[in-house]
Amino acid sequence: DFRASLDKMGFQFNEGRIIDASFVVAPRQRNTREENKAIKEGRGSELWNDKPHKKSHKDVDARWTEKRGEKFYGYKMHAKADQRHKMVLKYDTTSANVHDSKGYEPLLDESDEGKELYLDAGYESQEPIVERHRMKPVICEKGHRNHPLTDEQKKKNREKSKTRCLVEHVFGFMEQSMCGLIFRRVGI
């Protein structure tokens, strides 16, 4: 297997871990209001049974979401990468409307024990889950209304971000070198 080959060549994935998520755009669906209602209620598999060709082109798993005023339709890829090599060690795909902090736990396993886990501010409330997996959470802090970050917190965030941003290189590579993060399949 690929991972065993890398181990034989001396690649060691013993550094910390970095987790983040990125949108994967899917083709927009042209459904009627009734069809959309059925999909949202979880009855998407019951639709178009009399038209198998049409059903094979319909995606009932993709969802709409909005981030910073921009709307996305599709999925979200959650990835865990090695801190040193930027190698994706594990990934999972959810619909786009799932919050980053809800889709990362399946990526954690026993091989991560004792390692640092770098996360952005969106995972702020996830420290107990990370600690339950015997990892050391390194999470950027987030300011809140009427409670902005102090200069000391900003300085700590900059230090954490120097490592955490490496996972952005992984998504950037996929987007630039691998024809983007576009889902070319129907359904998860």
Over which residues does each language-model region extend?
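Helix-centered, glycine/charged polyanion-binding patches within enzymatic domains
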Residues: 116, 121-188
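Polybasic low-complexity intrinsically disordered regions
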Residues: 1-133
